[in-house]
């Protein structure tokens, strides 16, 4: 009977600790923060100002590891080892988000970015920031919004993630196990600093523009598939091109397509922005096949934002 009582007490204590941790993690880190979306439009139409900028958010991958069974899961209990490249006698992994736990990066395939388009009509200033990440928690987004509002007077800052499945974990559910966060605190701070810096730079780059808006609702149908019934998807590609009035040059473009950036799939161990990298490169610099130019690029900086991908839309 005493053992039963002791056991129940231990279980109760564990439940209390779990509930306390759960409640703590769900707390509002910004109780004073609120958003006022009541916007008074200008009395008369005026000039529209737009600015673009981009800042790298590529992590530094130091320690690597030895995937003896080739399943892209770090399993030291199976005899797998790490390479202490920085010589600090511990494993310093960059956990890749998406698909499954225990997927430490082995290197970098292409850079990750925080890309920003700022729009200002003289009365309201809005920043659209897209980061190469699987997702971004609200409280972390508020950190960026508060900085952007305080430093450069952005009325509203939209934080969008490309939802790439080959970037570091910024959510906290793709670490060493289901019970250990995969978020690297230093990297998180770096992403926030770089995103704010990109917003600041985009504001400095504000110039009068004209906008061209286009869409192709059918051309990308062969490249997206709904992997779950019922078959519902939005295959359309949409673009807003900002052209500087004075020079006639393209400052940048905001493009959107609804698809999961997961073409490299679950056994990839290299940091990558996946297909958004090539999407952006093509819009900026053109489509090439070897040395042959197939389509002219628009120039400027391309900001890619994802669309409705849940359900589940993936590359075909």
Over which residues does each language-model region extend?
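Conserved beta-alpha junction segments in alpha/beta enzyme cores
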Residues: 4-9, 17-316
């Amino acid at each position: 009977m005493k053992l039963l009582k002791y056991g129940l007490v231990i279980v109760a204590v564990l439940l209390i600790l779990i509930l306390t941790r759960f409640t703590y993690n769900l707390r509002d880190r910004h109780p004073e923060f609120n958003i006022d979306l009541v916007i008074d439009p200008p009395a008369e139409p005026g000039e529209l100002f737009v600015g673009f900028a981009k800042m790298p958010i590529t992590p530094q991958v130091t320690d690597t590891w030895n995937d003896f069974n080739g399943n892209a899961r770090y399993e030291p209990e199976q005899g797998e080892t790490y390479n202490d490249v920085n010589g600090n006698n511990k494993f310093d992994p960059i956990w890749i988000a998406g698909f499954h736990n225990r997927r430490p990066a082995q290197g970098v395939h292409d850079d990750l970015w925080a890309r920003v388009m700022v729009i200002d009509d003289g009365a309201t200033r809005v920043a659209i920031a897209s980061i190469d990440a699987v997702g971004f928690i609200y409280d972390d987004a508020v950190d960026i919004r508060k900085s952007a509002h305080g430093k450069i007077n952005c009325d509203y800052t939209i934080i969008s993630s490309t939802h790439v499945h080959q970037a570091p974990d910024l959510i906290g559910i793709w670490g060493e196990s289901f019970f250990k966060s995969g978020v690297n605190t230093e990297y998180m701070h770096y992403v926030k600093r770089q995103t704010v810096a990109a917003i600041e730079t985009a504001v400095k780059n504000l110039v009068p523009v004209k906008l061209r808006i286009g869409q192709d609702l059918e051309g990308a149908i062969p490249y997206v598939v709904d992997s779950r019934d019922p078959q519902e998807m939005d295959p359309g590609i949409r673009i807003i091109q900002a052209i500087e009035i004075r020079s006639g040059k393209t400052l940048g473009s905001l493009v959107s397509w609804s698809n999961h950036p997961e073409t490299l799939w679950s056994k990839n161990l290299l940091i990558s922005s996946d297909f958004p990298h090539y999407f952006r490169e093509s819009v900026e610099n053109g489509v090439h096949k070897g040395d042959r130019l197939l389509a002219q690029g628009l120039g400027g900086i391309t900001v890619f934002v994802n669309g409705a991908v849940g359900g589940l839309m993936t590359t075909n």
